[in-house]
Amino acid sequence: MATSKSGGSSKNGRDSISKRLGVKRSGGQFVRSGEIIVRQRGTKFHKGKNSGLGRDHTIFALKDGVVEFKTSKGRKYINII
């Protein structure tokens, strides 16, 4: 028979890896075609002129140009001008 009571296992001690989401290029910054501008979950930002929307809602540049963030009717759009 054990002389000391066995200790219980902890329910803590886990952490998920970060997903590295967010804005990668700011307004007024020059981008090349194919560069990622925003990584997001859902469409917090919507695609505008010369920008594309990936399967995971990533917004990327379709042409070389300057990033422009614009708000219209309560939605945030990303244009490449």
From Swiss-Prot:
Belongs to the bacterial ribosomal protein bL27 family. Residues 1-11 have a biased composition (Polar residues). GO terms for biological process: translation. One of its GO terms (cellular component) is cytosolic large ribosomal subunit. Residues 1-26 are annotated as: Disordered. The keyword Cytoplasm does not apply. This is Large ribosomal subunit protein bL27. InterPro entries: Ribosomal_bL27, Ribosomal_bL27_CS. Gene3D superfamilies: 2.40.50.100. PANTHER family: LARGE RIBOSOMAL SUBUNIT PROTEIN BL27M, RIBOSOMAL PROTEIN L27. Keywords: Ribonucleoprotein, Ribosomal protein. One of its GO terms (molecular function) is structural constituent of ribosome. The lineage of its organism: Bacteria, Pseudomonadati, Spirochaetota, Spirochaetia, Spirochaetales. It comes from the Bacteria.
